[in-house]
């Protein structure tokens, strides 16, 4: 065979191999999709595992993997796949963010003790952990599972720093969840965190949520006078019934501590009226 003809022959052979490979990959993808349609998640994942690496990372294969992983309860694998789909721009940025957030929260919810939750938290990437919804949810779950309060506060610190820099952020539902998460971790509050809370409150003196948190922090530090002052100002202004009720109850207990029966009766009445 002459040299030019040899090159033509080689190109044709490569094209045939490429075409055959594409046919095989297409058949594997169809088989995976059929397995998924039959709700055979493990079967679909097995078909996908047989694909070459390049084909397995294509958008269609990743979409099937995402659905199969979720169906199989493999949340961590689904989360990794969702991130890849986001990088491939398979979804809008908002949709990708929402999907990752939902899967991350699902992964955190599968933890049933602080050690499992710590492992799930570390399985998230830094971008996931920086999402306020994820960080607050993780912190609330850690508190619910009896985790260390200092660890809860550490997870919340980046979110806290973002929130106090945005005027009015703590009045939003997300900000109120942050306040509730921090309140659940006030036991053992150190001086550094008290200083952070008080500095934020002083910078935003009209923010009832910060006044409330500062007051509850002062209760934990046994700074009774400061606690009474902050909570007295915050209680009538709070829009959240649960926070308002707790503020009035705490004021009632502080009044009882100083043997002020009239103030205690008034605070208990206000707590009962909060709704």
Regions found by a protein language model. Give the residues of each.
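Structural motif corresponding to the intra-repeat A-B loop/turn of tetratricopeptide repeats
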Residues: 38, 72, 110-111, 145-146, ...
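Conserved small-residue packing positions in alpha-helical repeats and bundles
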Residues: 1, 10-13, 31-33, 49, ...
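Membrane-proximal soluble helical/coiled-coil segments
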Residues: 1-71, 77
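Alpha-helical repeat scaffolds
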Residues: 5-15, 41-52, 75-88, 112-127, ...
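C-terminal non-catalytic interaction modules
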Residues: 229-233, 237-275
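Alpha-solenoid helical repeat scaffolds
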Residues: 24-30, 59-65, 80, 93-102, ...
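Alpha-helical adaptor scaffolds
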Residues: 2, 24-37, 104-105, 164-240
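Short coil turns that delineate tetratricopeptide repeat
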Residues: 18, 22, 56, 90, ...
